[in-house]
């Protein structure tokens, strides 16, 4: 009888273990904000109303400005890179929509950051995905939402329009006096074509962006539309009033690759 009494007690003792201690440090993350501010030279960009002048002396207004920002990477003080997960790394900046110019990047590893990299455009991987796949939904959905509303996708030449700049100019040779720059081209689906994807690398000037669980840094990035006309190549509206999927579009892409700069960083 005593053997039957002792058995449960022995079983309880044999199954009792001290709590195991996990010495692994938890991964801490925070957020960083990116604010895109579109300007023309030293002036704030104003749609429709303000008139500007390019480097060759042609007046112009801006009626529409949209561009994709994707594949964001943040450079830490030690040179290592934090890559924003791709599914969270596609944005359509629209001058007509101020909220679209404010990007909040979450789940960023805590630390001090001294630079940023991003792509202007939508990479080939996303561009060749089937439209029904999850990776082509949200901001990249060509059939609904901002991409559809702003007509930022070519159905006739499948691919996204990386940058769309439209406006009026006395120098435009179109019948309605407008200019149209729709720049895209991811390199081709089955054969090599135009590749106007541009990787932008910016260093934070004399400042660092601090990311902690409680501190959020705001990085103000300016995009100077004047650089679209005046960069490695000087663009004349009279000579090129409409540029889309053509060899000449690469000159516009080369120009706008230089339009970004970091103005300041604010720590909240």
Walk through the language-model features, giving the residues of each.
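Bacterial N-terminal signal peptides that target proteins for export
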Residues: 1-5
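C-terminal motif of bacterial Sec signal peptides marking the signal peptidase cleavage site
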Residues: 12-14
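A short, solvent-exposed, low-complexity linear motif enriched for acidic/polar residues
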Residues: 17-268
